[in-house]
């Protein structure tokens, strides 16, 4: 694992010639004509990168770091994970796959972490790898003893404006006392931690988004005092629903795989290769 700053990652990009990593993380852009390797190596953070072995004394990047950056540059598919905790600054992470290699890039404020996640050549292996990385980012927690709840997403958006209207809406759905309490906690960002996952596919999106297609649904992992809850966006017919269920590892893994399968790559998500 390499831990550095946003500027440190910029230096590594300039030295390796990797023009783009994960724009969804809001990182410092690299301007190839201006941000040369020579200019980057004059940045004070270059000395820190040399001290940890990411750069050698000649200013060359460690081969392993170069490989990690190449996976980000040439990624075929990935997940964007946004994590929020009460009173804390959000963390964003991109879990990226190129061919059979997976790499993770995290950003928390000015700090970034770059590390390999492993390799996988089949769907079972890739699914286990992805849910393992999601669990690594979110931590391990007991599943909440929640009897599953399904709500109409459009009705929810139309009816709910604040905590009071949320409670009224949930009561109209005939939730029991435990369901009402847990769903209310999950919806309150001051009482729960949230991680939202969105799937990304490279090579098929519009030019304005660097040909990255962003999936049209999400999975959320919510940690409450009662335990972990999984929230999955589901479309049935012409209606959109939010399904809340106990956040066990297997339930989250299934929801994440269904999320990725909704990309154009479909069932080939673990082996899809983008056309350059």
Curated annotation (Swiss-Prot):
The keyword Calcium does not apply. Signal peptide: none annotated. GO terms for cellular component: cytoplasm. Keywords: Chaperone, Cytoplasm. The keyword Chaperone applies. It is found in: Cytoplasm. Pfam families: ESX-1_EspG. Specific chaperone for cognate PE/PPE proteins. Plays an important role in preventing aggregation of PE/PPE dimers. Interacts specifically with ESX-2-dependent PE/PPE proteins. Belongs to the EspG family. This is ESX-2 secretion-associated protein EspG2. It comes from Mycobacterium tuberculosis (strain CDC 1551 / Oshkosh).
């Amino acid at each position: 694992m390499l831990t550095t700053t946003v500027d440190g990652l910029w230096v590594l990009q300039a030295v390796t010639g990797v023009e783009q990593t994960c724009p969804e993380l809001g990182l410092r852009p690299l301007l190839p004509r201006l941000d040369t390797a020579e200019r980057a190596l004059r940045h004070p953070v270059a000395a820190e990168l040399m001290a940890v072995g990411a750069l050698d004394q000649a200013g060359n990047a460690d081969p392993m770091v170069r490989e990690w950056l190449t996976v980000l540059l040439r990624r075929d598919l990935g997940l964007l994970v946004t994590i929020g905790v009460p009173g804390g600054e959000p963390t964003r992470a991109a879990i990226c796959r190129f061919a059979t290699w997976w790499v993770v890039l995290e950003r928390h404020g000015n700090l970034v972490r770059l590390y390999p996640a492993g390799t996988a050549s089949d769907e079972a292996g890739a699914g286990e790898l992805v849910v393992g990385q999601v669990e690594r980012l979110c931590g391990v927690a007991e599943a909440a003893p929640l009897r599953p709840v399904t709500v109409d997403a459009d009705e929810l958006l139309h009816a709910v404006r604040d905590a009071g209207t949320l409670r009224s809406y949930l009561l109209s759905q005939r939730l029991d006392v435990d369901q009402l309490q847990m769903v209310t906690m999950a919806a309150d960002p001051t009482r729960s931690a949230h991680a939202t996952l969105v799937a990304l596919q490279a090579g098929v999106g519009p030019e304005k988004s660097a040909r990255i297609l962003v999936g049209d649904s999400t999975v959320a992992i919510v940690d409450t005092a009662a335990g972990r809850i999984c929230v999955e966006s589901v479309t049935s017919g012409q209606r959109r629903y939010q399904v809340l269920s106990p956040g066990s590892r297997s339930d989250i893994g299934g929801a994440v795989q269904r999320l990725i399968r909704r990309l154009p790559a479909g069932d080939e998500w673990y082996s899809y290769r983008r056309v350059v």
